[in-house]
UniProtKB/Swiss-Prot annotation:
Coiled-coil portions: none
Protein name: Ankyrin repeat domain-containing protein 9
Native organism: Homo sapiens
ANK repeats: 71-100, 112-141, 158-187
Task of the protein: Substrate receptor subunit of a cullin-RING superfamily E3 ligase complex (CUL5-based E3 ubiquitin ligase complex) which mediates the ubiquitination and subsequent proteasomal degradation of target proteins. Depending of the metabolic state of the cell, promotes the proteasomal degradation of IMPDH2, the rate-limiting enzyme in GTP biosynthesis or protects IMPDH2 by stabilizing IMPDH2 filaments assembly. Implicated in different cellular processes, like copper homeostasis and cell proliferation.
Length: 317
C-alpha cells in the first residue's frame, strides 16, 4: 500500500517546517528505492526477488505527492527496457490487464493507452513483444485493438502507431508480429502518413544518400535499405487490394527511380497502375488467413518465400 508523508508519523503534527522536512526525507527515500529497483531489473535478478522488492521495498513519488509501490505496468516498462524476459513473462501471466494498463502520470507524457507495445518495438524486444501479443489474445476485440493501434504522444512520438515505430526503426520481426496479430496498417501518424508512406519516404532518403564520391563504400547503405525493402514486402502482405493507392503521388513523382528501386511489378501495384502479381496475391491470402490466435506458430505450416524465412520471431536470436 502507498504510504503518505503527510499522514501522522510523517512529521505533519510538527507544523509546516516539520511536514516539509518529512516530505523531503520521503522523496529522498523514494529516489534511493527507485534506483535500487532499477538496478535489480537491469542486473536481471530473479523474479521472486524483484516481486518482493516491488511489493514491499521499492517506491516512487507519484503525481499526488505520495510514495507509491510500482504497479505491474510500471514494472513491465523496466523489464522491457532491460530485456528481463523472465520478469516480463511473469508480470504478463500473473497480472495480464494490470501489466498492460497505462502507468501513472510520472511514467508517461499524455493520456494515451499503455506504451508497452511501442516500447517493445523501439527496443526491439521481440520475445517480450510476442508474449504481450499472446496475452492480448484473451482481451476483448475492442480492448485488443486499442492497445495494438495506440497512437503515441503527438509531441514526443509524432502521433504514430507501433507500426510506424517498426517502420521508422527498421524492425521487420516486430512489424510482422504486429500485422499478424491484427494491427491496422492504414492508420496515419501526426504528419498524415501511413506506415507504408513513411517507409517509402525513408527508402527515398536511403536511395538519395548513396555515396557518390570516389572511393566511398558502395555497400554502406545496403543493409538498412534491404531491411526497409523487407518491411515493404511485409506491409504489402497485409495491404488490401486498392489500399496502396495513397502512395501513388510519392511513387509517380520520381517514376524511374522507384521503378529501379522496387522493381517493375511492385512499383506498378503500389502506384495503383496494376493489381498485385499472382504470387503476391496468393501470399496475401495465405498469410492473412492465419488467425491472431495461431500466429506466428501456423507459419511453420506454410511454404514461405525466402524473404520471410530468415525472420526470427521467437526473440531468442
Amino acid at each position: 500500500m502507498p504510504w503518505d508523508a503527510r499522514r501522522p508519523g510523517g512529521g505533519a503534527d510538527g507544523g509546516p517546517e516539520a511536514s516539509g522536512a518529512a516530505r523531503s526525507r520521503a522523496q529522498k527515500q523514494c529516489r534511493k528505492s527507485s534506483f535500487a529497483f532499477y538496478q535489480a531489473v537491469r542486473d536481471l535478478l530473479p523474479v521472486w526477488l524483484l516481486e518482493d522488492m516491488r511489493a514491499s521495498e521499492a517506491f516512487h513519488w507519484d503525481e499526488r505527492g505520495r510514495a507509491a509501490a510500482y504497479s505491474p505496468s510500471e514494472a513491465l516498462l523496466y523489464a522491457l527496457v532491460h530485456d528481463h524476459q523472465a520478469y516480463a513473462h511473469y508480470l504478463l501471466a500473473t497480472f495480464p490487464r494490470r501489466a498492460l494498463a497505462p502507468p501513472s502520470a510520472g511514467f508517461r507524457c499524455c493520456a494515451a493507452p499503455g506504451p508497452h507495445v511501442a516500447l517493445a518495438v523501439r527496443y526491439n524486444r521481440v520475445g517480450i513483444l510476442r508474449r504481450i501479443l499472446r496475452t492480448l489474445r484473451d482481451f476483448p476485440a475492442e480492448e485488443r485493438a486499442r492497445v495494438l493501434d495506440r497512437r503515441g504522444c503527438s509531441r514526443v512520438e509524432g502521433g504514430g502507431t507501433s507500426l510506424h515505430v517498426a517502420c521508422e526503426l527498421a524492425r521487420p520481426e516486430c512489424l510482422f508480429l504486429l500485422l499478424g496479430h491484427g494491427a491496422s496498417p492504414g492508420l496515419r501518424d501526426g504528419g498524415g502518413l501511413t506506415p507504408l508512406e513513411l517507409l517509402l519516404r525513408q527508402l527515398g532518403r536511403d536511395a538519395g544518400a548513396t555515396p557518390s564520391a570516389a572511393g566511398a563504400p558502395a555497400s554502406a547503405p545496403g543493409e538498412p535499405r534491404q531491411r526497409r525493402l523487407l518491411l515493404l514486402d511485409l506491409l504489402a502482405l497485409y495491404t488490401p487490394v486498392g489500399a496502396a493507392g495513397s502512395a501513388r503521388q510519392e511513387l509517380l513523382g520520381d517514376r524511374p527511380r522507384w521503378q529501379r528501386l522496387l522493381g517493375e511489378d511492385k512499383f506498378q501495384w503500389l502506384a495503383g497502375l496494376a493489381p498485385p502479381s499472382l504470387f503476391a496475391r496468393a501470399m496475401q491470402v495465405l498469410v492473412t488467413a492465419i488467425s491472431p490466435g495461431r500466429f506466428p506458430e501456423a507459419l511453420d505450416e506454410l511454404p514461405l518465400p525466402p524473404f520471410l524465412q530468415p525472420l526470427d520471431l521467437t526473440g531468442k536470436g
